């Protein structure tokens, strides 16, 4: 049955792996900037993005001024506290995602959205480049109504920018309220800092997000 399972097809909750009640252990500090991996300072906000393999996505965001911390994990699915191996089966419903804690006085949520749209291909469905499966889908998981509004508005602007550039593909990015974010195993946290020559499939399509009118 596993051999015939199509990892590009979304699953329902009744088909998801059971997972576990025990959360994944999380390192206390981010290895790049030594900030807390879990705490959100009072004046900061959280965003969650999925853009394919989370290794390159996490690096993209930790390099941005105003980003306090980043974490690789899983979001948008059903299985509680999944392992990486479980997510790779396509039977958890989760996407590989990155949790971004940021200071809105330094970098705004719309600026993070610009990084999101311009640094991956949001029109590939259940894949990102050579990485194939529902875990690699493009998604924005919103935590406030303001984030949801901004995400949907930027979606429309980027879709029009693609059309204007001669790209007639439809955006497949999933925009929905964030469910639980489950931290990935420690080996996946800040992976490209620990493994500078590691795999990074991140890349845009050469289209820029136009300024908000």
Swiss-Prot record:
GO terms for molecular function: L-methionine-(S)-S-oxide reductase activity; peptide-methionine (S)-S-oxide reductase activity. Residues 1-20 are annotated as: Disordered. It is an enzyme of class 1 (oxidoreductase). Gene3D superfamilies: Peptide methionine sulphoxide reductase MsrA. The active site is at 53. InterPro entries: Met_Sox_Rdtase_MsrA_dom, Met_Sox_Rdtase_MsrA_sf, MsrA_MetSO_reductase. Keywords: Oxidoreductase. Residues 1-12 have a biased composition (Polar residues). One of its GO terms (cellular component) is cytoplasm. One of its GO terms (biological process) is cellular response to oxidative stress. It catalyses: L-methionyl-[protein] + [thioredoxin]-disulfide + H2O = L-methionyl-(S)-S-oxide-[protein] + [thioredoxin]-dithiol; [thioredoxin]-disulfide + L-methionine + H2O = L-methionine (S)-S-oxide + [thioredoxin]-dithiol. It comes from the Bacteria. Its EC number is 1.8.4.11. It holds the Pfam family PMSR. Belongs to the MsrA Met sulfoxide reductase family. Has an important function as a repair enzyme for proteins that have been inactivated by oxidation. Catalyzes the reversible oxidation-reduction of methionine sulfoxide in proteins to methionine. PANTHER family: MITOCHONDRIAL PEPTIDE METHIONINE SULFOXIDE REDUCTASE (PTHR42799:SF2). This is Peptide methionine sulfoxide reductase MsrA. It comes from Dickeya dadantii (strain 3937).
């Amino acid at each position: 049955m596993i051999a015939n399972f199509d990892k590009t097809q979304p699953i329902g909750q009744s088909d998801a792996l059971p997972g576990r009640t025990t959360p994944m252990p999380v390192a206390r500090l981010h290895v790049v900037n030594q900030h807390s991996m879990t705490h959100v300072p009072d004046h900061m906000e959280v965003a969650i993005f999925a853009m394919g393999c989370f290794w390159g996505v996490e690096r993209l965001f930790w390099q941005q001024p105003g980003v306090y911390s980043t974490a690789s994990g899983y979001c948008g699915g059903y299985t509680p506290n999944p392992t990486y191996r479980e997510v790779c089966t396509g039977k958890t419903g989760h996407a590989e995602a990155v949790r971004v804690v940021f200071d809105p006085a330094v970098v705004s949520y719309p600026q993070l959205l610009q990084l999101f749209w311009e640094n991956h291909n949001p029109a590939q469905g259940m894949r990102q480049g050579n990485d194939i499966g529902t875990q690699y889908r493009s998604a924005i998981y919103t935590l406030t109504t303001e984030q949801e509004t901004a995400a949907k508005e930027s979606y429309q602007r980027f879709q029009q920018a693609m059309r204007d550039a001669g790209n007639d593909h439809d955006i497949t990015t999933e925009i929905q309220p964030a469910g639980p974010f489950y931290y990935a195993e420690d080996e996946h946290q800040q992976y490209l800092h620990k493994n500078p020559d590691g795999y990074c499939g991140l890349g845009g399509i050469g289209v820029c997000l136009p300024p908000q009118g």
